[in-house]
Amino acid sequence: MKLYYEKRGQGDPIVFVHGNGEDHHTFDTTVEVLEADHTCYAVDSRGHGESPSVEELHYEDMADDMVEFLETHDLNNITFFGFSDGAIVGLLTAMKTDRIGRLVICGANTEPRGIKGWAYRMFRGAYFLTHDPKMKVMLREPHITEEQLKQITIPTLVLAGDRDMIRERETKKIAAALPNSTLRILEEATHISYGQNSTRAAIEYIAWVQDLENR
């Protein structure tokens, strides 16, 4: 599938993938921070933004789209920067290609019940009213095992907020299973506040990369 994207900056490539119901503008502020030293590709996932609409959404299909995107644009050794659903797609994409050199996952879950109960009930109610495929995929997917996570050996920054809608034990489980991960639980941060149009994740990313380079 041909995905819409916007490209800004120059330097090491970063591919940004947004969350559910969003589009590439989720990362406008993040890109502003990073574009001086990076070529930033902000992508609209299938069924979102200006990319083609679909009747059904599945995270595996979205990951396949990203593999195709990297191959089409001949991108190698990229940083994959995913928020929420985009973080799920990042994990799955990293299992499918060796074109990713570093991974940043913000607010990821490996199973639907990794979402806190109040949020899950809210999404279930929204799906009951709208039958929106974007709601449906959150209620039924993903199903990523710890064994699968152990296959991802690239450096990975795992971010979440201390007030995130993702259960903290879920975030810690993901970080523990990834062999080469760094975990950051951000104080006074909700699921949205550090991920959408925020400098916070960008600052955490810069500090993490500097730490990797100094090891």
Feature roles, as predicted:
Residues 1-14, 37, 206, 210-215:
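Alpha/beta-hydrolase fold catalytic core
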Residues 6-50:
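Conserved HGGG/HGGXW glycine-rich cap/lid loop of the alpha/beta-hydrolase fold
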Residues 41, 45-79, 203:
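Active-site loop/oxyanion-hole signature of alpha/beta-hydrolase fold enzymes
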Residues 88-95, 103-131:
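Flexible "cap/lid" loop of the alpha/beta hydrolase fold
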Residues 133-148:
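Active-site nucleophile elbow and catalytic-triad environment of alpha/beta-hydrolase enzymes
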Residues 151-152, 158-160:
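Short beta-strand/loop motif that positions the catalytic acidic residue
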Residues 165-170:
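Conserved alpha/beta-hydrolase "acid-adjacent" motif
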Residues 187-215:
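Catalytic active-site module of serine/aspartate enzymes centered on a nucleophile-bearing elbow/loop
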